[in-house]
Amino acid sequence: MTKEQFIADIRAGIPETLPEPQIYDTSINHAPKRKDILTAEEKKLALRNALRYFPKKFHATLAPEFANELETYGRIYMYRFRPTYEMYARPIDEYPHKSQQAAAIMMMIQNNLDKAVAQHPHELITYGGNGAVFQNWAQYRLVMKYLSEMTDEQTLVMYSGHPLGLFPSHKNAPRVVVTNGMVIPNYSKPDDWERNNALGVSQYGQMTAGSYMYIGPQGIVHGTTITVLNAARKVGGDNMKLFVTAGLGGMSGAQPKAGNIAGVVSVTAEINPLAARKRHEQGWVDELHENLDELISAIRKAVEEKRVVSMAYVGNVVDLWERLAEENIHVDLGSDQTSLHNPWAGGYYPVGVSLEESNRMMAEEPELFKEKVQESLRRQVAAINKLTADGMYFFDYGNAFLLESSRAGADIMGENGKFRYPSYVQDIMGPMFFDYGFGPFRWVCSSGDPKDLETTDRIATEVLEEMRKTATPDIIGQLDDNIHWIKEAGKNKLVVGSQARILYADSEGRTKIALAFNEAIKRGEISRPVVLGRDHHDVSGTDSPFRETSNIYDGSQFCADMAVHNVIGDSFRGATWVSIHNGGGVGWGEVINGGFGMVIDGSEDSDRHIRQMLLWDVNNGISRRSWARNKGSIDAIKREMERTPGLTVTLPNFVDDNIINEAYK
């Protein structure tokens, strides 16, 4: 397809003539059939809802086709309308646009749907099994059309993938406001998602999937590297560490690369051969093993030789854990990144049942499938418990492993009624990073030029090294890890999709790096605008009692004021787009999370937006964490108040335990 044809296709939106039906591409990793949950009348409603995107002249042709999709796949994806052009993040100037900010958003959307990046690209799923950009291809086409037409005096409103329309606003307002899965709390159970999504009225946006901010597995590589590094430090000793986990999907696929960067032997189980081979072909995992005998031998050899290597076991994770326990292999670090936020719809596959049979069972015999999953979790936990008794440090990686294992009746609870194992936020990420404002800051070079990315890496390194000279002792370790990360980033070949980078930085670091980028754009040192953003998995963006806010102990870990305030505050301080989601990470109904994107172009407006918005985006969460009496956050917010005129935060007073105990003796 020529550039002119691409531009015409974007501008057309819903085509005037029906495109030809497309052949189902079996070389692409597809989403499993979803649960058949709708009644006969609800299926008619789903069909009526889908057809409202199209003129009447198409209805007679599309109605049976969409009905067949609903019966075959459990959703109406509108495959016929999937564009025939290649999906990837093009340089910003290749998109038809009246607003440069809108063109940047188009680039970010296409990156989320790139087949090299997305988990189920033809079903518009970026990662996590159900993390959707849109619900169907009509929504994609309309959104791209609107973005190509809009000006900086308009805002596009997005309801769970559906473009409500373009509304008049002003240049300092967000260009796009996104909500995903915002349902009434009483209707936020997993089956409510299944029903609403099948009806075409809501979607699960995960975190960066539905907010157009995914940068491929690099995003999670950095967080996983930091987690594994610090977990290894907790374990101590100078032996070669063995790290065992599961999942090679859109997010979990980062684990082998993170293991290599952290300098360990890693073994990652993955049930889906397509996913495992994809990561191997991309160079994100070194070895594939399908035979447990050969794998065990390879593990022993690598540990003995102290050879850093990443291995993938193409099979069920329970078989792996049980074999490790049976062989008395010493595992130093253990975790799990299966998509247990979505346990009944392809996020976790039970032991003893093939991938194909599981996909059939979850759609046709959902109750039996649930029983198999829960039985599998009980066996997995039993094997993990045996290995932790022999010295393994196990941590929950925020995927609802502990939560779903407890619901399955596994031996996962301690004597105090709390989980036997910590979440990684409780033990590592929370007290060492989030409490001090360090989180997953990221940027994308809209030129698509690797040279621009190299320039940003150099600038970020210079900023962090300068900060380190005057840093307090409690954050020097965090700065050192991130300086090392950014210096090695190019060598580690982390880019998949757009020219993007991530590093963990605090409020001061993010602001100084962004201002330095903006100055470099102004000078022409960086050739085109840069998109700033972050994962929702951050200091302020997410309220999640089993992950991001699991180290909040004042009882407010189940409250979502922080995440909601964050997106509101970002929206009027300079964000180019904002999003707020139900779910993300731990699952639908368990989390409220939000994010932003900011296009900086070398202007004074960008300078102002950087200073105002990034300060709020980080310090909102530090303030909340300090009120929860987290010591690191109290220290961090005191430093910020000294640094920032006009910032006044309410600080907690500490009560002597004896006074409390005396009052309730």
Which residues does each PLM region occupy?
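General beta-strand structural signal in soluble alpha/beta enzymes
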Residues: 155-160, 178, 245, 268-269, ...
